Structure formats: structure tokens, C-alpha cells
A protein has these predicted regions:
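Bacterial N-terminal signal peptides that target proteins for export
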Residues: 1-9
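Short N-terminal edge-element motif at the start of the domain
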Residues: 34-133
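Short helix-loop boundary/capping segments
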Residues: 130-207
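C-terminal segment of classical bacterial N-terminal signal peptides
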Residues: 13-23
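Long, compositionally biased interface segments
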Residues: 203-266
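Boundary at the C-terminal end of the N-terminal hydrophobic targeting segment
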Residues: 23-26, 31
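Non-catalytic macromolecular-recognition regions in eukaryotic signaling proteins
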Residues: 56-57, 61, 66, 146-149, ...
Length: 266
């Protein structure tokens, strides 16, 4: 029995860790639950494999924080297409309206957090789990041998990275050992960027496509507008070290558009 549990955890861990992969849009996977990312302005979807949405973050443990360069989702504030593939996705609508000062990289390309620079769009994921775990490296930290099938909830904010100390400080949204009511929690979550769109979906990352679907069930909460974040605060997060061992931004999964792979948004 113990070997079976370890095998199950190993399999799920492998499914959670994002890799790279190519798929033909003509080949739609079948038999899977709803997939992510999506256009959050469209509420339609015909996937019938519904599941109970995860509780609010206050009832779950924060298990991981990571970023993707360019938004994986498409939304009202991030609708500028950035291309196909793992380096595609969507950009904040104001990306082309930044000043020269906002676009200046204070490290001249040598920032500690790799894969971003001023002017880039990033999508940040605060991943929460119903398991009794501690935050750590990779999404595998969201489960354990004793909790191999957790309820997962991802809080999401898309940021426009700028060189401006008056912009948001990423440190305000990190972990730093913060506990509340016995649960691991982010210091805070972004506000003022619209009511989050909540829906049933899956894990993301460039490993998956419409032909290669993720089997995991994830509740998503995606804020619809971009916010500016100071690039220096992201560099500092990596330079100082973080429990997630995040030192670079990840690639994206291309938008899921097939109705049979999307849940209806209530």
C-alpha cells in the first residue's frame, strides 16, 4: 500500500511540474475536465466534468508562488496578443504607453530574477492547497504522501513590470513565513484590479495544450485588470532568496478555446 501511495504522489507531482511540449490545435483531447487558461470575458463552456470549487484562500494553505512571463489568460486589461508558443500569451493593454524612465532596467539586464525586464507582463499565481503542507519549491509542494488529491485554488494577478518605486511592491504579496489561523498565507493579495473571475479549470504551463490536457482539478480566481509592479521588488525577491526557490519567470500555456474543454462561468 505504501508503494502505491508513493507511486500516486510521484505521478501527480510529475503532472504538476510544467515542462515544454507542442500540440496541434486540430487534435482536442477527450475525457478530461475543464482546462486553463482561458479568455475570462467569455463565460461559455460545455465541459461536463464539473467538480466542487475549492474553499476561499483563508481556509487553505499557501503552497507556492510563481510567475509566467506574459499572461496565460486573456482578460479586459490584458488582451494584447504576444504570440504563440511558450513565450507567447497576452500583454497588458498599457504595455506600449510606458515612459522611458519606466522602461529603464536599473540592473542593465543583470537582475536576480531572470526572464523579466521593465515593460514585460507577468502573470503571478498564488497556489493554495487543502493539504497540511508547508510552502516550497514547485507545485509538488502542494501535496504529500498523506494528501495526494488536494483541493487546489490559484489566485491570479497580471502585472505590468515597471521601473518605478511608486508602483506596487511585490514584497507586499509574498509569504515570508506569514501564518494566519494556523494556515500558511501570503502577506496580502492584490486588490483594486476588479472582482476576480472564478471558474473550474486545470493546471497550466507550456507542457499542456488542447491536445495534451492536464487531469488535475483547480479552482481559478483571476483578477480582470493589470497593475504596475516595481521591477526592483521582483529582483529583490529572488536576490534575498525565497522558500519557493523561484529565480526566474516561466513560460505559458496557450489559450484554451475549445468549448468542450472549458467550464461555464457562473
Amino acid at each position: 500500500m505504501r508503494l502505491a501511495v508513493i507511486s500516486s504522489v510521484s505521478m501527480i507531482f510529475g503532472l504538476l511540474v510544467a515542462g515544454t511540449g507542442n500540440a496541434s490545435a486540430a487534435d482536442i483531447c477527450t475525457g478530461y475536465g475543464p482546462q486553463t487558461p482561458r479568455d475570462i470575458t467569455s463565460i461559455s463552456g460545455t465541459n461536463k466534468r464539473l467538480f466542487t470549487l475549492a474553499p476561499a484562500t483563508a481556509e487553505l494553505n499557501l503552497c507556492n508562488i510563481h510567475t509566467h512571463t506574459n499572461a496565460e489568460h486573456k482578460g479586459p486589461g490584458f488582451s494584447v496578443f504576444a504570440g504563440k508558443g511558450p513565450h507567447g500569451g497576452y500583454k497588458c493593454n498599457d504595455s506600449d504607453m510606458l515612459t522611458a524612465a519606466e522602461l529603464k532596467d536599473p540592473t542593465n539586464g543583470k537582475g536576480a530574477f531572470q526572464g523579466i525586464k521593465p515593460g514585460d507582463t507577468i502573470e503571478v499565481h498564488w497556489v493554495h492547497s487543502s493539504c497540511d503542507i508547508k510552502p516550497g519549491k514547485g507545485l509538488g509542494s502542494c501535496l504529500s504522501q498523506k494528501c495526494a488529491n488536494p483541493q487546489l485554488r490559484v489566485e491570479t494577478q497580471v502585472f505590468l513590470v515597471v521601473n518605478d518605486k511608486n508602483a506596487l511592491n511585490f514584497a507586499d504579496f509574498t509569504y515570508g513565513g506569514n501564518m494566519k489561523n494556523g494556515l500558511h498565507q501570503a502577506k496580502s493579495l492584490p486588490s483594486g484590479t476588479g472582482t476576480p473571475v472564478v471558474f473550474a479549470g486545470s493546471t497550466t504551463g507550456p507542457k499542456y495544450t488542447q491536445a495534451k490536457c492536464s487531469p488535475l482539478q483547480v479552482t481559478w480566481s483571476v483578477r480582470p485588470q493589470c497593475a504596475k509592479v516595481h521591477v526592483g521588488s521582483l529582483y529583490k525577491w529572488a536576490k534575498d532568496g525565497n522558500v519557493f526557490q523561484e529565480d526566474h519567470s516561466h513560460g505559458v500555456r496557450q489559450l484554451v478555446t475549445a468549448q468542450e474543454l472549458l467550464s461555464p462561468i457562473r
